[in-house]
Amino acid sequence: MTVTYPACFFKEEGGYAVVFPDLNFLATQGKNLDEAFKMAVDVLAAYLYRPAASQVINPPSPLERVSLKETAKAFKSEVNPGSFVNYVSVDVEKYARENFNCSVKKTLSIPMWLNDIAVEKNVNFSKVLKEALIEKLNIQ
């Protein structure tokens, strides 16, 4: 699912601060514009990937409704030359698969006889479970 949200890119000494006003002023930063965009994509994907049950995800505002001045005011900050508003887009599920790929430990039960045969044949249980889940969930 690709999502697109407006973000305020504030030019600051040493880089850019990026704020998503629609998402409770979610923020990140970068040393330069390229890094700021990459960090904006990362924080947007992380925020939307597994929201808390109580977390309200506001719909994105039209770009023309997002004000640098109003957003800066929320932080008691100024708008420096070189600041701008732009859309940031990310395919949340794809980004998560490619970048949030940390392993989690799972405890499961299988029949002893099956375990004995698998151990004898040096089966990698984690690999088999991962491959079976990918197939079962029809994930590419």
Predicted segment positions?
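Short, charged, surface-exposed hinge/linker loops at domain edges
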Residues: 2-4, 45-108, 113-121, 127, ...
